[in-house]
Amino acid sequence: MKKIGIIGGTFDPPHYGHLLIANEVYHTLELDEVWFLPNQIPPHKRNRNVTSAEDRRKMLELAIEKEGYFSLCLEELEREGPSYTYDTMLQLTKKHPDTTFYFIIGGDMVEYLPKWYNIEKLLELVTFVGVARPGYTLQTPYKILTIEIPEFAVSSSLLRERYKNKKTCKYLLPEQVQSYIERNGLYES
């Protein structure tokens, strides 16, 4: 059986925090790969303007290009409508029956698990891996694996705000992602 970690998100933009989480879980659980799963329309962020799927895909490709065990999974970007993890994982488990999936989530999402669409059935498809995040406990009524990682308190919303206010983002996200953002004028207003 292959062991694949999945880290889902908007990745608007992807940053070193995402890469750190993926790398730590990869090594701790001795995974074969980690797939980055950018979502089309996250159900919990429907009212927020999200950078285009194409720009987010390109930034994510740039962010993970140097790591052989990181891959891009476009399952949700290629599907219209809201991105429900249950629907995605149902498709992926059918396509990859020889794989055990570990779905990686931050502490903020661990607390939100009871509200996830079809959570009981989703728990039959994946093992959730909760990663500690500042300000959140890993409390949930569900059985999950928990992993402590070095704290890196950066978020995509912080980066968007810094770009909007013309502050430096150096050392917070990969240089090639930073160049892409600047070249394409993302997050300027």
Swiss-Prot record:
<comment type="function">
    <text>Catalyzes the reversible adenylation of nicotinate mononucleotide (NaMN) to nicotinic acid adenine dinucleotide (NaAD).</text>
</comment>
<comment type="similarity">
    <text>Belongs to the NadD family.</text>
</comment>
<keyword id="KW-0548">Nucleotidyltransferase</keyword>
<keyword id="KW-0662">Pyridine nucleotide biosynthesis</keyword>
<dbReference type="InterPro" id="IPR005248">
    <property type="entry name" value="NadD/NMNAT"/>
</dbReference>
<keyword id="KW-0808">Transferase</keyword>
<keyword id="KW-0520">NAD</keyword>
<comment type="pathway">
    <text>Cofactor biosynthesis; NAD(+) biosynthesis; deamido-NAD(+) from nicotinate D-ribonucleotide: step 1/1.</text>
</comment>
<keyword id="KW-0547">Nucleotide-binding</keyword>
<dbReference type="GO" id="GO:0004515">
    <property type="term" value="F:nicotinate-nucleotide adenylyltransferase activity"/>
</dbReference>
<dbReference type="Pfam" id="PF01467">
    <property type="entry name" value="CTP_transf_like"/>
</dbReference>
<dbReference type="InterPro" id="IPR004821">
    <property type="entry name" value="Cyt_trans-like"/>
</dbReference>
<dbReference type="GO" id="GO:0005524">
    <property type="term" value="F:ATP binding"/>
</dbReference>
<protein>
    <recommendedName>
        <fullName>Probable nicotinate-nucleotide adenylyltransferase</fullName>
        <ecNumber>2.7.7.18</ecNumber>
    </recommendedName>
</protein>
<dbReference type="GO" id="GO:0009435">
    <property type="term" value="P:NAD biosynthetic process"/>
</dbReference>
<dbReference type="InterPro" id="IPR014729">
    <property type="entry name" value="Rossmann-like_a/b/a_fold"/>
</dbReference>
<keyword id="KW-0067">ATP-binding</keyword>
